[in-house]
Amino acid sequence: MASTTPITMEDLQKALETQSRALRAELAAGASQSRRPRPPRQRDSSTTGDDSGRDSGGPRRRRGNRGRGQRRDWSRAPPPPEERQETRSQTPAPKPSRAPPQQPQPPRMQTGRGGSAPRPELGPPTNPFQAAVARGLRPPLHDPDTEAPTEACVTSWLWSEGEGAVFYRVDLHFTNLGTPPLDEDGRWDPALMYNPCGPEPPAHVVRAYNQPAGDVRGVWGKGERTYAEQDFRVGGTRWHRLLRMPVRGLDGDSAPLPPHTTERIETRSARHPWRIRFGAPQAFLAGLLLAAVAVGTARAGLQPRADMAAPPTLPQPPRAHGQHYGHHHHQLPFLGHDGHHGGTLRVGQHHRNASDVLPGHWLQGGWGCYNLSDWHQGTHVCHTKHMDFWCVEHDRPPPATPTPLTTAANSTTAATPATAPAPCHAGLNDSCGGFLSGCGPMRLRHGADTRCGRLICGLSTTAQYPPTRFGCAMRWGLPPWELVVLTARPEDGWTCRGVPAHPGTRCPELVSPMGRATCSPASALWLATANALSLDHALAAFVLLVPWVLIFMVCRRTCRRRGAAAALTAVVLQGYNPPAYGEEAFTYLCTAPGCATQAPVPVRLAGVRFESKIVDGGCFAPWDLEATGACICEIPTDVSCEGLGAWVPTAPCARIWNGTQRACTFWAVNAYSSGGYAQLASYFNPGGSYYKQYHPTACEVEPAFGHSDAACWGFPTDTVMSVFALASYVQHPHKTVRVKFHTETRTVWQLSVAGVSCNVTTEHPFCNTPHGQLEVQVPPDPGDLVEYIMNHTGNQQSRWGLGSPNCHGPDWASPVCQRHSPDCSRLVGATPERPRLRLVDADDPLLRTAPGPGEVWVTPVIGSQARKCGLHIRAGPYGHATVEMPEWIHAHTTSDPWHPPGPLGLKFKTVRPVALPRTLAPPRNVRVTGCYQCGTPALVEGLAPGGGNCHLTVNGEDLGAFPPGKFVTAALLNTPPPYQVSCGGESDRASARVIDPAAQSFTGVVYGTHTTAVSETRQTWAEWAAAHWWQLTLGAICALLLAGLLACCAKCLYYLRGAIAPR
C-alpha cells in the first residue's frame, strides 16, 4: 500500500465542500434539462420521509441514512433553490394573534463561493445528527439510489488513569470515505473517524481522542460491532481509547485493522474473522476457577459430622510386639497416630503435655498416654521396636499379692494396676516379676562389652483406649451414606439402634450422650443449619462468604477498569500453583559468618551487616598520661628539663613539663655511703628544703634507702645514684575519638539457601526459595548504638556502646554528653588529678602486678657500660574522676555491637510437587549405621543423583526428599538388612552396619526434655482429590451456579459501565 499524507480536519472539510458543490451543480443541471410533470403516486404509509425526487417505476426503494431518533433522511444533499420554491405551498399562512417566539437561527456555515450564508432549508437542529451538520460537518455523500449504512451514530469511549474510573462517552458519525488511510509511518489516523453527533466532549478529551497512536492493546468484538483499544500518553497523562471500527467500507472491502505490535490478526479467516483478546469471558473464567478453588478447599462439613466435635483422624494400625513380651501384651498402652501431639501425661498429681515429657523421637512414632503414680522417681526409658516404657528405680518392696485390676465407671482408663515395683538387683538373671511392663536388664551401649548391667524395674502402665474415630463407607460408588466405626472408646457410649458400637460397625447414624454422628449430606446440612446460631458456625459461614465477596469485587473492578482484566487473565492463562508444603524441618544455625547446616537443603550464613540512621556526634581529643625520666650515677645540681638535658629528651620533657597536673620526683640512692653523713643527710630532710638551698630544683626530693645501686656497676660501693621521673596529663597530637549515633538499627542476616541468596530481618524473617520457604527465628535488633572511632597515629579502632547514654545520670561526664568540635581540638572533661610516682626495685614482687590507676612505676635498669644506667617506666590507668578517657570507653563498650544469645532457629517447609516426580537413578554409596527396631534413629548417608529432589526410600519406607549431592539423615528403621534404597525408580543395595535388636532391646538412656523436628505426612494432589471427590463435585456445582450469577452481573456492568456514569 502506498503511503499518503495525513488528512487533517481542514482537508476533510474542504473535500466535503468540494464534493457537495459538485453534486449540487450536477443535480441542478439534470433538473433543468429534463423537467416534466411526474404522475401522482400513492404515498406509502410505512414511509415517513420526503418522497420527492424518486422515480415510482424504479426497481429500488430509497432508504435514508437514519440514525437513532432521526425522522428525516439526511444522507443526501439538500434540494436546489428552484426545486425548493416549487415545492413550497403558495397559500399564505394565517397571521397569529400575537408574535410567535423567535426561533434560534442556525449558524452561518462556510460555502464554496467565498462567503457565508444561512441554511434555511435545515431549520434549527432537532437531533444530535442535525447539530453535527449545523456545526459544519457534512453528512456522508451517497447515491440516492443506493443503500446507506443503517447505523449513523455510534459510541466510543475514553478514560484516563489520572482521573480515576471516569469514562467519557463520545458519540460520533463515520465519515463515509471508504477505507481509512494510513500515515507515512504506518500508523492509523483516528482523526478521520471523529465526526461527533452527540454532546461536545471537553477540550482535553477531544485532544486525547485526536491523538494518533499506532499500538493496539486489544480488539473487542460484539456482534457486528468491533472496537480497537489503544493506550497512549497526552501531556504526561496516560489515556485509554476504545474506538468503534466499521465492519465494511463503501468500496466493498473489509476495513483493515490498525497495525498490531504484539500479534498478527487475520481478518479473512472464515471461522474467526476477529480475534478477541482480554474479553469478559476470560475474567469470568478467572472468577470461576477462583470460586472452584475456594469451595473445593473449604471443609464444608461433608466428612463424618458430630454435633459436639470434629471427628479425629484414622489411627495407625498397632505394631506387633516381640515374643519375649507376649505375656505383657495386655498391660502395654495402646498405640496412637503418627505425628499426633495432643496427648497428656499424668506425672504425680499434674497433667502435662506428652511432647514435653516424653522423649523427642516419640513424636515421630506411635505412642499412648501413660499414668504414673505419685512416688515414682525414675526417668529411664526402655526401648523395643519403637515402643518406649517408663522404668523406675525404687527400693520399695513389692506386696505379697498383687492387687487385681479394676475398671472405674465413667473413667477414661480401662485398667489401673495397683502394684509397686520390685527391688532392683545387679544380676542379669534376676527379674522383676510378671506384672512388669516389659522392662528388663539394662545393657551397655557397646555390644562387645560383657560387664553386667543393672536391673531397671518397670511399672505397669495405665492402659487407655484411643479416642473414637469414624469413617464414611461408599456403596457402589454412591455418596457416602454409612458411618464406619474405626476405633471406639466404651466410655463415650456410642450406639447404633440401641446396640453398643464396636470397631468395624457400619451404621447410618450413631447416637451417644454427647450427640449424633452421621455421613449423610442431608443430615450434615441439618446439623449445620441447627447450629448456625453458634459463633463457630457463624464464623465459618463468614469465612466461606469472603471469597465470593472478593470475587464479586474483582469482577466489578475488572468491568469498570479493564486494567485488572488483563492481569487476571494472564494469571489464569499462564497458570498459578499455590505453594503446598509437604515436609517441615527445624534446626539451628550458629551466628558466626560461614556457619552451615542441613535443613534439609544446605543453609549457610554468608554474613551479618547492620543498617541504621547515622548522626555525627562530633570529635574530641582524650587526655593522655605521659611520663619520662632518667637514671644518673651521681646527684645532679639542677633537676629540671634544662639541667637534665644530657639524660632526658628535651621535646617530651618540655611537653610533659607544660602539661596539666604534673608530678616530678627526685630520688637519691645510698646517700649515706659517700662520706659526710651529717652534711649529706641534711640534704634530704623532709620536703627536701636543704637540698633546694644548694641545688636548684622544682621537683620533690626524696631519699631511696635500701635500693640497689648496681645499675652503676664497676665502681666502689660508695657511689651515689639518683633517679628522676616526670609525668603529667597532656593532649596527644595523634589521638582522637569521633562519636557517631546509630538509630533505628536493623540487623540483616545474609543467608545462602541451596545456592539462593536472601536477606532476613526481624521485619521480614522469611526466605522463599524454589525448594520451599525458610522461616528464621532471628534475635531482636540491638536498638540504638553509639560508635566510638578511636584513631591513634593512623590506626582506627571502633568500639560500640549499647543504648543511648543517660546524660542526666551517671553518664553526665561521658564523651557522648559533651560538646565536641569538628576538628577534634577540644579536650573533654575536667582536669585530671596529679599522677603518683613510685620507685620500684628490679626484684620487687610488686612488679608482678600492674600499676594502679594514676600510678607511674620507675625501675632502674643496669646499663651496657659502666656508669651508664637506664630507667623502665610503667604507667597505669588514668584513674581520675572524669570518664572521658579511652579506659572508660573500653570499659563501657564492646568490639562487636551485638552478640546474639543463641543460634538462629531455622524452620524449613519443603514444597509439595503437584505433578508426580520423574524417575531418578538410585542413590549411590548409601551407608546405614546404627540399629533397627530399637527406638534409636539410624544414620543413613549417601549421594543423591541429579535431575531433581530424591525422595529416598529404604525398604519401602520414605525418609524424605533430598537435593542432588551428599545427604545425611537419621531414620527409625523397622526392618533388618539388607536395605534396598531408591529415589522412586530403580533400587540399589546399601551397605549396612547395624546392631542386633536383641542386644539393643534396652538402651538405658536417660532422657530429659527434648525438641526435635516433626515431619508431616506428604500427600499428592491426586490422593487428596480421590479422598475428597464428593466435596469437589458439590463444590464444582455450587461454583458453576454462583459463577453464572456473577457472570450475569458482571456482564451487565461491563456493557453499561459508561452509561452508568457518563461525563
From Swiss-Prot:
Ranges in the topological domain labelled Extracellular: 301-534, 583-1028, 1050-1063
Binding site for Ca(2+): N670, A671, D718, T719
Biased composition annotated in UniProt, kind: Basic residues: 59-69
Glycosylated sites: N353, N371, N410, N429, N658, N759, N791, T1011, T1012
Region ranges (Disordered): 1-131
Chain segments carrying region Functions as E1 signal peptide: 563-582
Biased composition (Pro residues): 93-107
Stated name of the protein: Structural polyprotein
Source organism of this protein record: Rubella virus (strain RA27/3 vaccine) (RUBV)
Lineage: Viruses, Riboviria, Orthornavirae, Kitrinoviricota, Alsuviricetes
